[in-house]
Amino acid sequence: ATLWEQHASENSSADFIYKGPAGEEIKFIFNTFGYRLKKIRGTVPYRRLGLYTDYPFAPLLTGTGCPFSCAYCASSALQRKFARRETSEVVQEIREFYDSGVRDFAFYDDALLFDPDLHIKPILKAIVGAGLNARFHCPNGLHARFVDDDLASLMRASGFKTIRLGLETVNRGRQKQSGGKVTSGDLEHAVQVLKRRGFAKEEIGVYLMYGLPGQGLGEVKEGILFLESLGVRIHLTEFSPIPGTEYWRVLVENGIVGEGTDPLLTNNSVFSYLFSGYDPCEIDQLKVGVKKYNFEDFRERRGQTR
């Protein structure tokens, strides 16, 4: 219960509430209940436990935590340190999955592209060198700032099929306020590089947030028009306030949330409707418009094949 520890303590009736990642610190829990662990053996990769069979896809996590501290993100609260696995270990994991029949891989890192020359590029070069005919997907938002021609070439050669870039907003002031990890210029450059290397609209998606503190729908509409001009898929994402983040502090100061707030009310599916001051009909219209735009090329291709 790392994010909602107090709420869990007051409402769960649990004997013990643990906060933080379940690593070596887990020994403390056993000690609390009178158990003494003499030794903790090294962890065995789950793929070697005999439980992962006949799956066509596999998740990949090459590191935990994030070197950035965005105002809306809880990554630094969940993982206080940014740590990465050895690239050789990651490549070995991919090869073992591949040998077992897996062809689709999904990266779930919060900062997969950070320091690319020392991490993701060596991984992709090894994949290309091994001749693996695999497909890679990145559902988490990638940092557009790190996408250069060399990286885009490696992503194309290694089989990337799903690319998601994080923009969140086109408002320059809010970009700086929320962490400064990316600018609209960074994103535009990344998209141009990716397209130059052969990636199509349906392979490049960009996350655009709505419901941020103080954000009007006009700003969201401006972001939609910007992304349409770049010819990428648009993924509207609802803001959800998370305890421990900068935006949570802002909302507490403004009296919108507090210690007594029910976690269900902060869910992204309802928060923007309840607390952002938006017209629900206008939000729905935006979503419909984005959906139509996203599938324009699909309908055109389908019409051409008839």
What are these regions (language model features)?
Residues 45-201, 210:
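Radical SAM [4Fe-4S] cluster-binding motif and immediate context
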Residues 18, 106, 164, 235-236:
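Conserved beta-strand positions in the central sheet of alpha/beta enzyme cores
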Residues 12-15, 34-36, 124, 154-155, ...:
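Short, hinge-like loop/turn segments at secondary-structure boundaries
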Residues 1-42, 238, 244:
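Glycine-rich beta-alpha loop elements in corrinoid/cobalamin-binding modules
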Residues 5-12, 150-151, 213-228:
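Catalytic cores of alpha/beta
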Residues 13-14, 156-162, 229-233:
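Glycine-enriched alpha-helix->loop->beta-strand junction motifs that scaffold or abut catalytic
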Residues 3-9, 25-28, 69, 114-116, ...:
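Short catalytic/ligand-binding loop motif for oxyanion handling, primarily in non-cytosolic enzymes
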Residues 203, 218-306:
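C-terminal accessory regions of radical SAM enzymes
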